[in-house]
């Protein structure tokens, strides 16, 4: 491990990520915030060597003394306190950081980022990899595995079971840190709704064999700050293990281990020589024929005519054989379809790769937020055409009616767990533009009741009306009756739930499962009384187009790299 620089407390020594040619000594100041507002902090840019990591703990914040002080004051339910080291990141990207932590995409891990959006959405990326404990829920059994072994227990409600795990790591929110510093990262599959709503059945088939839910329990991770061009390596000090100093040092050791990985070059990862001769579109293996999907649309319209529902969202899945590495597919997808919610989840036996435009539910600072999205147009070729398309979209009565229906669903979902009179719609039917399309977007907010948690908010809002229909329960019953296979991760929730109780989840749209060399894509269409069966089928294919393009691009990238190198690495 060579010389480098890090952001450290004045007088401290620390290991960093810049090459020796850029390292040196010096001091710079910046205005403090949060608990440091009463003073100006000084940070040392320090030349370091591979000397003992215990000496480097001086650049860890809070210090052991501060942790002792905080531990004496916290509520008895608090089990952990986050500590961190801050590093410069002007020569890094979230992709390079992930490759370093995962040793070339060989270890399970996660990358959550926002490639497109405002500062609130896009400032931070969250990256982790290593020997995390894993949480898998399948057939009513929760399995928690770590380096010491596995434990199992029976559950009735997956979110209640998840809450019990999180309670053992409970932390207080720290205003000086980003909103996510550790917790569970993963997905809650669509069929989990059967645990909350017993009336909802499930489709007969199970083509993917995924668990009901899967999460990494991430107590150490990297928070990448795009605005400050810095990284925080965060871990958690356990307060319930007797020896506080030993617990603090264990957290420092985890930070040191992660920092050490950040010092090196991003490793290459294994690529497979192409064996697929056919174009991607000629490798489609749908689980539903076009004729069958049109029949599903007509069946839904009969239910609408009978007064059972107003709208329903049947879907189809397409499987595609591919030699492309899942991480190359993710790298391609983030360029093909930049979105507010970009995610790569590696669970070893399967990967979840997605670029979702739509928030499911967020809980932050006591506020629940839901973002209904309905109504879509492509971006214009010119600024004038773009404006015209937006005006045409917002004036479309059918699109407006569907959107208002979803806003009402969102108000009902949030209202079930919000304080009386607190539900509001701060944004109603605004055009929001993305890289390739524009949508009608609204926001629904409410103050979470004091006796409830973020998991209660997720339960109330899950799944989104965007992927089910209205009324939601009856629409889901019809989906279970009509669709060929269970949905699995598709239409579920992807994101994180923080040890401090915060949460940010998106709907698993524009998402694929990659397992055993097969990429599985899924999309649905919102069927109403006057929908065209042909049009709805075409819409499902259109929604998968960015995913197909990502696979095509990933295969081309890998084959080009292999041709140039004559080897098997990127």
Positions of PLM-derived features:
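Short linear motifs in low-complexity or flexible loops
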Residues: 6-8
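Extended alpha-helical targeting/anchoring segments
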Residues: 45-570
